[in-house]
UniProtKB/Swiss-Prot annotation:
GO terms for molecular function: GTP binding; GTPase activity; metal ion binding. GTP binds at residues 226-231, 245-251, 270-273, 335-338, 358-360. This is tRNA modification GTPase MnmE. Keywords: Cytoplasm, GTP-binding, Hydrolase, Magnesium, Metal-binding, Nucleotide-binding, Potassium, tRNA processing. Residues 216-377 form the TrmE-type G domain. K(+) binds at residues 226, 245, 247, 250. NCBIfam families: mnmE_trmE_thdF, PRK05291.1-3, small_GTP. Gene3D superfamilies: P-loop containing nucleotide triphosphate hydrolases, Probable tRNA modification gtpase trme, domain 1, tRNA modification GTPase MnmE domain 2. It comes from Escherichia coli O7:K1 (strain IAI39 / ExPEC).
Length: 454
């Protein structure tokens, strides 16, 4: 398998459809056109032609589009064949194309990978293609499109350029120490560094919003049996996703629902009631509940308000709180306010949010929705944002750490060499986002998650 091979793949989803598209990219795309179509179509014009088998019989007829490189998505010669979307027809056409020597099925994401390697896209834009396809809300789709059009890359490139200028200034001060002006202590470098740090902080804030849009928040509902966990899942989901009865232990396994709160994806997980298991099935369900809790972004500690007046989670169930992972945020949800007569709403107890509601009637559930959105710092008024992945957040975080360390070196010891090194490392972290500085292993992991035809 070589990167110089000509590749082919179906660009439309598998299964029956009105239209099915095969995409070919590489040096032999021209030969495919001449062999299957009998001619080379006019560049960038839709040509309605028969698609022929090796014996000259017609396999299908449809639209052929020819994009000679480098003016194509991949930067190579690209041919698209748009025929009928029946799986048998597409399979016959694909087999016909693969009889031509030098062609092979594309790896997942290989078309986008070639576009990146041929400088048609940077890495953040290439990732945005997959994010646009996988977008689960209108806001996520718009943000992914902004990233694809270069909004995120432009912000990162601006930071890289600012760091380049700052490095030049710092290294000039190091190389010419005998100048009358002490460049390191005259305040200009500190001012420029502060500007870069402020710009980076703004990008990090937007990236966190973009990450929430892409990945969402994982919330686990946990508590004793019959506390109303499944009723809360149904209230948040807006449908009967879980079976609700008065019988303790009705929920035996993990139930998952995917919803949106003003555009923010929320992964809600209902778990088995936590207690001493009465049988093997319940024991497995409780083990799975704890596994989900350990991976959660937040736990909703569900409490039956008719069984206790306590509001401090440690007082309600100290063993449960002690077993939770350190620093895992907890929201105490006192349920059945319709029975207890408690005042609906949110307050705080020993650093934990406390919400009183009725999962059965839905009263107070909107307060919980707003709390979940605000607890993640999600801004529904964000305009023109971009999507971001975990690796982007990590790169931005590492760059920020290097800039803060560089600032400490500047102000503490006027150590120009150490400042220059921290600036270089920060610049390297930022360049990883757009792919200017990256490893082949990282590229392989990124593009392998794409669709075959992308």
């Amino acid at each position: 398998m070589s990167d110089n091979d000509t590749i082919v793949a179906q660009a439309t989803p598998p299964g029956r459809g009105g239209v099915g598209i095969l995409r070919i990219s590489g040096l032999k795309a021209r030969e495919v056109a001449e062999t299957v179509l009998g001619k080379l179509p006019k560049p960038r014009y839709a040509d309605y032609l028969p698609f022929k088998d090796a014996d000259g019989s017609v396999l299908d007829q449809g639209i052929a589009l020819w994009f000679p490189g480098p003016n194509s998505f991949t930067g190579e010669d690209v041919l698209e064949l748009q025929g009928h979307g029946g799986p048998v027809i597409l399979d016959l056409l694909l087999k016909r194309i693969l009889t031509i020597p030098g062609l092979r099925i594309a790896r997942p994401g290989e078309f986008s990978e070639r576009a990146f390697l041929n400088d048609k896209l940077d890495l953040a834009q290439a990732e945005a293609i997959a994010d646009l396809i996988d977008a689960s809300s209108e806001q996520a789709a718009r943000s992914a499109l902004n990233s694809l059009q270069g909004a995120f890359s432009a912000r990162v490139n601006h930071l890289v350029e600012a760091l380049t200028h700052l490095r030049i200034y710092v290294e000039a001060a190091i190389d010419f120490p005998d100048e009358e002006i002490d460049f390191l202590s005259d305040g200009k470098i500190e001012a420029q560094l502060n500007d870069v740090i402020a710009d980076l902080d703004a990008v990090r804030a937007e990236a966190r919003q973009g990450s929430l849009l892409r990945e969402g928040m994982k919330v686990v509902i946990a508590g004793r049996p019959n506390a109303g966990k499944s009723s809360l899942l149904n209230a948040l989901a807006g449908r009967e996703a879980a079976i609700v009865t008065d019988i303790a232990g009705t929920t035996r396994d993990v139930l998952r629902e995917h919803i949106h709160i003003d555009g923010m994806p929320l992964h809600i997980i209902d778990t088995a009631g936590l207690r001493e298991a009465s049988d093997e099935v319940e024991r497995i369900g409780i083990e799975r509940a704890w596994q989900e809790i350990e991976q959660a972004d937040r736990v909703l500690f569900m409490v039956d308000g008719t069984t206790t007046d306590a509001v401090d989670p440690a007082e309600i169930w100290s063993e449960f709180i002690a077993r939770l992972p350190a620093k895992l945020p907890i929201t105490v949800v006192r349920n059945k306010a319709d029975i207890t007569g408690e005042t609906l709403g949110m307050s705080e107890v020993n650093g934990h949010a406390l919400i009183r509601l009725s999962a059965r009637t839905g009263e107070g559930v909107d307060v919980l929705r707003n709390h979940l959105k605000q607890s993640m710092g999600f801004d529904t008024n964000m305009e023109g944002g971009f999507l971001a992945r975990r690796r982007h957040l990590q790169a931005l975080e590492q760059a920020a750490e290097h800039l803060q360390q560089g600032k400490a070196q500047l102000l503490g010891a006027w150590a120009g060499e150490l400042l220059a090194e921290e600036l270089r490392l920060a610049q390297q972290n930022l360049s990883e986002i757009t792919g200017e500085f990256t490893s082949d292993d990282l590229l392989g992991r990124i593009f392998s998650s794409f669709c075959i035809g992308k």
